[in-house]
Amino acid sequence: MSKSLQAIRGMNDILPEQTPAWRYLESTLVSLLDGYGYKEIRLPIVEYTELFARGIGEGTDVVDKEMYTFLDRNEESLTLRPEGTAGCVRAVLEHGLAGGGQVQKLWYAGPMFRYEKPQKGRYRQFHQVGVEAFNLPGPDVDAELIVLTWRLWKKLGLADAVTLQLNSLGSSEARAAYRDALVAYLQERFDQLDEDSQRRLTTNPLRILDSKNEATQAVLVGAPTLGDYLDEESRLHFEGVKARLDAAGIRYQINHKLVRGLDYYNRTVFEWVTDKLGAQGTVCAGGRYDGLVAQLGGKATPGVGFAMGVERLVLLLETLDLLPAELNRAADVYVCAFGEAAELAALTLTERLRDELPGLRLLLNSGGGSFKSQFKKADKSGARYALILGDDELAGRVVGCKPLRDDSEQQSVAWDALAEHLAACQQA
């Protein structure tokens, strides 16, 4: 007996009963991004491996352990994208979108891929919405991105469920000086570090700061902090970000251990975290990457952005019961018809209603059946009303309009008055 085919572990189907929540989240965010002047860009999910090795950084967990990399038929190394910023920067460079200092505000959405241990809120194929801004070096756009995310949380009802953590990584020179000081401190306490942190001490020591190991965290209590090594320009930039967040009324926590897992960040970094999802608490994260464009072969170009995880945000909305109840309603109106002539008339009426009321979700019964069986399907669809068309209604050129969600009486409505009647019902 052949083995039944299944999805790859950690790569999940998003089923019809789940997609309304995804569409609700994505449409809410896209509406916000439009309002802030960000334009959509669509990017490949496969890039040359070199892009991520140069952009994300050798020695990072993402590049060393987590990428899906393979050789194509030309023996070229390709990788399923593990994140979106590097690919977006590549597109901006390739098409000259930021040439001559022109400002670009872009967003993209789609699947990312990392070989990680699958668990709730962490998958091998996961979906992100990413937002990037180029040629804006000041603290104002850093703050704008954070304010934008804050507005999204308020729209979704999540404002009390998330906390903003904020830090500045300073310039590359300041970060290098801090790196040396941190390494010197930790080398003296090498035996007290967990095995993973011992390895990172030579490959990516800043990542030790967000170790989840309790013994390592105890060692870090007395470690030097990034704030002690900030250059003056970065300090003023960070003060500018904080001043704007204060003016917008957005609360934040300074987290000197917040470094982010990708090498390209400098100056502002931030994360929105929640305590409602256990270990997978980061729902949105980003920061400034002023050196990345040059690192990938372009002219020095300021950049800043963020990405948010769709799966985690949907999970958070579900956990807190914040999804609108009507999301699971397949239709507003279910059209029932019995008899061949009635079915033909129902088709004509339904299509006319689609023209006259384009926002109305109409589900025309398929597969025949008695009125009793059709009413069961109408109820299951979540529709608020059933339209009934049989021989009697056909003869009188009327339609029975039956409320399904309250005790109101069924009404007979003339065909020509049906659109007006349903529009009024929707407003009620």
Swiss-Prot record:
Protein's cellular compartments: Cytoplasm
Pfam families on file: HGTP_anticodon, tRNA-synt_His
Record GO biological process: histidyl-tRNA aminoacylation
Enzyme Commission identifier(s): 6.1.1.21
InterPro entries in UniProt: aa-tRNA-synth_II, aa-tRNA-synth_II/BPL/LPL, Anticodon-bd, Anticodon-bd_dom_sf, His-tRNA-ligase, HisRS-like_core, HisRS/HisZ, HisRS_anticodon
Catalytic activity: tRNA(His) + L-histidine + ATP = L-histidyl-tRNA(His) + AMP + diphosphate + H(+)
GO MF annotation terms: ATP binding; histidine-tRNA ligase activity
A GO CC term attached to the entry: cytoplasm
Keywords: Aminoacyl-tRNA synthetase, ATP-binding, Cytoplasm, Ligase, Nucleotide-binding, Protein biosynthesis
Record family assignment: Belongs to the class-II aminoacyl-tRNA synthetase family.
Subunit record text: Homodimer.
HAMAP family listed in its UniProt record: His_tRNA_synth (MF_00127)
Protein name: Histidine--tRNA ligase
Species for this entry: Ectopseudomonas mendocina (strain ymp)
Lineage: Bacteria, Pseudomonadati, Pseudomonadota, Gammaproteobacteria, Pseudomonadales
Gene: hisS
